[in-house]
Amino acid sequence: MKKWLPVVMACLLSACSSSGSDSKTYYQLPLPQAGVQSTASQGSRLLWVEQVSIPDYLAGNGVVYQTSDVQYVIANNNLWASPLDQQLRTTLVANLSNQLPGWVVASQPLGSDQDTLNVNVSGFHGRYDGTVVVSGEWLLNHQGQLIKHPFHIEVKQQQDGYDAMVKVLAQAWSQEAASIAQSINRLP
């Protein structure tokens, strides 16, 4: 029995010491509060958010952090709970639905007489100076007319850490959704 005691103690100690270093944290972009329910009726305008695309460096599971002007780190333990492009599309549809009264906004095709929005996100990360970056461009097909608009948003984090970074990234993405909604509201 005494021979096994050191082996059992060593196993217990190694199990305790390794469990904390491999802990993973998963992040989901928060959805905005639900606004007015949209129902299709005569005269409703339809918007299909067809795609939100992201580059390869953002397409993995890890949250991305820029450590210098040319270097990026993809986190191993701070991960997206679901694919980032899906989260961006879901939150964009929710934000636009809230900000476009009289419109039905969906992530599925709505019919032949719909506007179509595609967004290409080129940056969605934290940066070494405490700023988050959300950048890219969107393309709207409005009644056969193509409208293309670049965006670049930088917002300073007020707190350190991945939790704060993800919250500020969501805030910046919501800010861009508001800008898209303003552009759509100005359409004839």
Give residue ranges: language-model regions.
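Short secondary-structure boundary motifs at beta->alpha junctions and helix caps
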Residues: 71-79, 145-175
